[in-house]
Curated annotation (Swiss-Prot):
<feature type="domain" description="Fibronectin type-III 2">
    <location>
        <begin position="222"/>
        <end position="322"/>
    </location>
</feature>
<dbReference type="InterPro" id="IPR013783">
    <property type="entry name" value="Ig-like_fold"/>
</dbReference>
<feature type="region of interest" description="Disordered">
    <location>
        <begin position="719"/>
        <end position="754"/>
    </location>
</feature>
<dbReference type="GO" id="GO:0044297">
    <property type="term" value="C:cell body"/>
</dbReference>
<feature type="compositionally biased region" description="Low complexity">
    <location>
        <begin position="729"/>
        <end position="753"/>
    </location>
</feature>
<comment type="function">
    <text>Signal-transducing molecule. The receptor systems for IL6, LIF, OSM, CNTF, IL11, CTF1 and BSF3 can utilize IL6ST for initiating signal transmission. Binding of IL6 to IL6R induces IL6ST homodimerization and formation of a high-affinity receptor complex, which activates the intracellular JAK-MAPK and JAK-STAT3 signaling pathways. That causes phosphorylation of IL6ST tyrosine residues which in turn activates STAT3.</text>
</comment>
<dbReference type="GO" id="GO:0008284">
    <property type="term" value="P:positive regulation of cell population proliferation"/>
</dbReference>
<feature type="region of interest" description="Disordered">
    <location>
        <begin position="658"/>
        <end position="678"/>
    </location>
</feature>
<dbReference type="Pfam" id="PF09240">
    <property type="entry name" value="IL6Ra-bind"/>
</dbReference>
<keyword id="KW-1015">Disulfide bond</keyword>
<dbReference type="GO" id="GO:0015026">
    <property type="term" value="F:coreceptor activity"/>
</dbReference>
<dbReference type="GO" id="GO:0097696">
    <property type="term" value="P:cell surface receptor signaling pathway via STAT"/>
</dbReference>
<feature type="disulfide bond">
    <location>
        <begin position="134"/>
        <end position="144"/>
    </location>
</feature>
<dbReference type="Pfam" id="PF06328">
    <property type="entry name" value="Lep_receptor_Ig"/>
</dbReference>
<feature type="glycosylation site" description="N-linked (GlcNAc...) asparagine">
    <location>
        <position position="225"/>
    </location>
</feature>
<dbReference type="Pfam" id="PF00041">
    <property type="entry name" value="fn3"/>
</dbReference>
<feature type="glycosylation site" description="N-linked (GlcNAc...) asparagine">
    <location>
        <position position="476"/>
    </location>
</feature>
Length: 917
């Protein structure tokens, strides 16, 4: 901290620590030391002494003193009360450069009152200055420099002192602490003693003194007017000239000369022994022809004492031209040709650099020799020549020419296209190093004339533009000297060239510097199965690879599952994901990696099928085969059992349409024009019709074994035929003898004769009152007859005076019960009521159907016997009384006499039997 700032801070503290009642008063106390400076790392103790007047005014003592550093209270452990007026504070290992230390007292209700304050500084004492040196600049005062040592962190004064043996020179106060220039001109050839003194608040120290002659510390002024000239006789020399002062000739100086080419950064030193003697000119030799050089020069006392002058200003010059030092690099390319006898050959060469051209190249001379006697010469100003050559062997030579002369010829053998190259380099490698692309190889066993290196950028969007360079036969490692780009793939080819022609070529790919791919691969599914998927992708275009693709990574996951990653070699373009779940959506992302990083491609999704390929077929085909086999077995079984099946499903039912019963009804006109006696009864049978009046009596219950309708018991006793089951139930078809007025027919009729049909006519025909028809359910599967399908054809004609009555035709009607035992649960009375409630047409139809059934399906001998026995047992005699008794025996009520229909029973008997009445 500077002195003005310290005094300002102290003045501020003074005003803060004095009481003011219209005037300034003395402070209450003081701090000792008042200006403390402490060496860093040491201990320091400060003392605060209170005045007696302050003690009495504020009613305090030393125990009320509070120490603060930078407005922070000092811990009580560091404070010591010496007596009632004195308190001390101790600091250990002081490290802060500056500390504001104040002494305060607590008065009037613990109010802090500042008493006094000081600024405590810390630092180091000055080190002893070292390395004291002095330089006498030509024409200027002497400048001395030294090393002050470590930083003191305090204000330190450095003073340069000098004296002769008998005289002291004025001191030089250093402003920077490291150097000082004296205010007087030194005297040469008289020794002077010089030293440095350093002083601050913590101490004072002096350097070692040096004693010297100022002339030995002289630093000359730089040479000037430096010029460079060349020589036409010698293209490898340049002449230099300059001017140096040397204290106006009082000093002998030697020179130091350096040079470099214009584009170089490194200077070349001229040997010092060549310039030991004082001079103002010099000739530099062994330079390259037609090359621009830059020179500089400096001087020093010839004895070597003192200091080198600063470098002079640079000067440049160009050597004279010379013939080219070496032939150009020479190579050829064969262009595609449509002819078979000639070929197009493009001869190419590199322009010589200035260091080898030794001048300006005017043109190139190309000589093509097919044989020793045949040659062609071409003069070309460019760097290529295209010629048409035969398929013979040629030798081409190339020479560059400037105004001084021609270079040596470069010879290249162009073999016949039928010759095959035999040798090539081996172990070809390429690698980047120091921002250069290096190529290394092993030479072939045959001696080589030179090597040709070719390279180009591989791209799918642009053609491969080749660049090339030539290397000597002794080289097997070099770097490509073209302008190479990063992240580009270069195809490098090395071809050895022999005296007989070029050998085999070897190629490889390399990058100057790789990077991450510009884009990732696009993956797709080639085949998706139930538990696996074949992924396929295309190679990334070489323009987007930016390096060698080392491997691929495939990341796949489900919508809720964990992501799985697999790594695939870069040579593959397909990969099979296995252990997948069926009927699941998968998200796939693929990345390609080079040596410098990777790049992800777009995300792709696919769904695995629920069933594997062929799995459905494996299920469906056996099921279909099993079904087919079952069907075939069923068909075979049905075929073998067709008779049994037909019996249960399609039984043989008589065709009612072929029945002629309807034509035998006396009340129904025949629907067919035929003679009944001639056609149906050719044997003389005829119809015997009987009219029977039936009286109902229900006083007696029906026996349990009687299940037939009572009306049907009134059939003729003499008949032996059986009622057919057609058109009526089995209960109603029980065989009963009929009542006939002619009793002689009963004995005359044989047991073999049968009733062909019978017709029951209700008594309602007398009253001409039609009744509601009653139908029973039929089990027949045959189609209905015309009269059944069209009931409107049915007619019921009654005559009041007993005229003819036309009844409807019902050739066939079959009920559920086919045997008497089939209806045991229905009472005889209920069945009788059902019959009585029907109209005349119902009974006519029932009997017609019974007769038809008898005609189509006659009973067996046993059935006829049982029927005859039942008929005989039920017969009760003839006459009206007999009729009444038979009716009562079946339980019919006599009170319904008017409701019981009369039976008109036509019967068919053979000749000599019962005749119709």
């Amino acid at each position: 901290m500077s002195a003005p700032r310290i005094w300002l801070a102290q003045a501020l503290l003074f005003f803060l620590t004095t009481e003011s009642i219209g005037q300034l008063l003395e402070p209450c106390g003081y701090i000792y030391p008042e200006f403390p400076v402490v060496q860093r790392g040491s201990n320091f103790t400060a003392i605060c002494v209170l005045k007696e007047a302050c003690l009495q005014h504020y009613y305090v003592n030393a125990s009320y003193i509070v120490w603060k550093t930078n407005h922070a209270a000092v811990p009580r452990e560091q404070v010591t009360v010496i007596n009632r007026t004195t308190s001390s504070v101790t600091f250990t290992d002081v490290v802060l450069p500056s500390v504001q230390l104040t002494c305060n007292i607590l008065s009037f209700g613990q109010i802090e009152q500042n008493v006094y304050g000081v600024t405590m500084l810390s630092g180091f004492p000055p080190d002893k200055p070292t390395n004291l040196t002095c330089i006498v600049n030509e024409g200027k005062n002497m400048l001395c420099q030294w090393d002050p040592g470590r930083e003191t962190y305090l204000e330190t004064n450095y003073t340069l002192k000098s004296e002769w043996a008998t005289e002291k020179f004025p001191d030089c106060q250093s402003k920077h602490g490291t150097s000082c220039m004296v205010s007087y001109m030194p005297t040469y050839y008289v020794n002077i003693e010089v030293w440095v003194e350093a002083e601050n608040a913590l101490g004072k120290v002096s350097s070692e003194s040096i004693n010297f002659d100022p002339v030995d510390k002289v630093k000359p002024t730089p040479p000037y007017n430096l010029s460079v000239t060349n020589s036409e006789e010698l293209s490898s020399i340049l002449k230099l000239s300059w001017v140096s002062s040397g204290l106006g000739g009082l000093l002998d100086l030697k020179s130091d000369i350096q040079y470099r080419t214009k584009d170089a950064s490194t200077w070349i030193q001229v040997p010092l022994e060549d310039t030991m003697s004082p001079r103002t000119s010099f000739t530099v030799q062994d330079l390259k022809p037609f090359t621009e050089y830059v020179f500089r020069i400096r001087s020093i006392k010839d004895s070597g004492k003192g200091y080198w002058s600063d470098w002079s200003e640079e000067a440049s010059g160009t050597t004279y031209e010379d013939r080219p030092s070496r032939p150009p690099s020479f190579w050829y390319k064969t262009n595609p040709s449509h002819g078979q006898e000639y070929r197009s050959v493009r001869l190419i060469w590199k322009a010589l650099p200035l260091s080898e051209a030794n001048g300006k190249i005017l043109d190139y001379e190309v000589i093509l020799t097919q044989s020793k006697s045949v040659s062609q010469t071409y003069t070309v100003t460019g760097t290529e020549l295209t010629v048409n050559l035969t398929n013979d062997r040629y030798v081409a030579s190339l020479a560059a020419r400037n105004k001084v002369g021609k270079s040596a010829a470069a010879v290249l053998t162009i073999p016949s296209p039928h010759v095959t190259a035999a040798y090539s380099v081996v172990n070809l490698k390429a690698f980047p190093k120091d921002n250069l692309l290096w190529v290394e190889w092993t030479p072939p066993p045959k001696p080589v004339s030179k090597y040709i290196l070719e390279w180009c950028v591989l791209s799918e969007n642009a053609p491969c533009v080749e660049d090339w360079q030539q290397e000597d036969a002794t080289v097997n490692r070099t770097h490509l000297r073209g302008r190479l780009l990063e992240s580009k793939c270069y195809q490098i080819t090395v071809t050895p060239v022999f005296a007989t022609g070029p050998g085999g070529s070897e190629s490889l790919k390399a990058y100057l510097k790789q990077a991450a791919p510009a884009r990732g691969p696009t993956v797709r599914t080639k085949k998706v199965g139930k538990n696996e998927a074949v992924l396929a992708w295309d190679q990334i275009p070489v323009d987007d690879q930016n390096g060698f693709i080392r491997n691929y990574s495939i990341s796949y996951r489900t919508s809720v599952g964990k992501e799985m990653v697999v790594h695939v070699d870069s040579s593959h373009t397909e990969y099979t994901l296995s252990s997948l779940s069926s009927d699941t959506l998968y998200m796939v992302r693929m990345a390609a990696y080079t040596d410098e990083g990777g790049k992800d491609g777009p995300e792709f999704t696919f769904t695995t099928p629920k069933f594997a390929q062929g799995e459905i077929e494996a299920i469906v085909v056996p099921v279909c085969l099993a079904f087919l086999l079952t069907t075939l077995l069923g068909v075979l079984f049905c075929f073998n059992k067709r008779d049994l099946i037909k019996k249960h499903i399609w039984p043989n039912v008589p065709d009612p349409s072929k029945s002629h019963i309807a034509q035998w009804s006396p009340h129904t006109p025949p629907r067919h024009n035929f003679n009944s006696k001639d056609q149906m009864y050719s044997d003389g049978n005829f119809t015997d019709v009987s009219v029977v009046e039936i009286e109902a009596n229900n006083k007696k219950p029906c026996p349990d074994d009687l299940k037939s309708v009572d009306l049907f018991k009134k059939e003729k006793v003499s008949t032996e035929g059986h009622s057919s089951g057609i058109g009526g139930s089995s209960c109603m078809s029980s065989s009963r003898p009929s009542i006939s007025s002619n009793e002689e027919n009963e004995s005359a009729q044989s047991t073999a004769s049968t009733v062909q049909y019978s017709t029951v006519v209700h008594s309602g025909y007398r009253h001409q009152v039609p009744s509601v028809q009653v139908f029973s359910r039929s089990e027949s599967t045959q189609p209905l007859l015309d009269s059944e399908e069209r009931p409107e054809d049915l007619q019921l004609v009654d005559s009041v005076d007993g005229g003819d009555e036309i009844l409807p035709r019902q050739p066939y009607f079959k009920q559920n019960c086919s045997q008497p035992e089939a209806c045991p649960e229905i009472s005889h009375f209920e069945r009788s009521n059902q019959v009585l409630s029907g109209n005349e047409e119902d009974f006519v139809r029932l009997k017609q159907q019974q007769v038809s059934d008898h005609i189509s399906q006659p009973y067996g001998s046993e059935q006829r016997r049982l029927f005859q026995e039942g008929s005989t047992a039920d017969a009760l005699g003839t006459g009206a009384d007999g009729q009444m008794e038979r009716f009562e025996s079946v339980g019919m009520e006599t009170t319904i006499d008017e409701e019981i229909p009369k039976s008109y029973l036509p019967q068919t008997v053979r000749q000599g039997g019962y005749m119709p009445q």
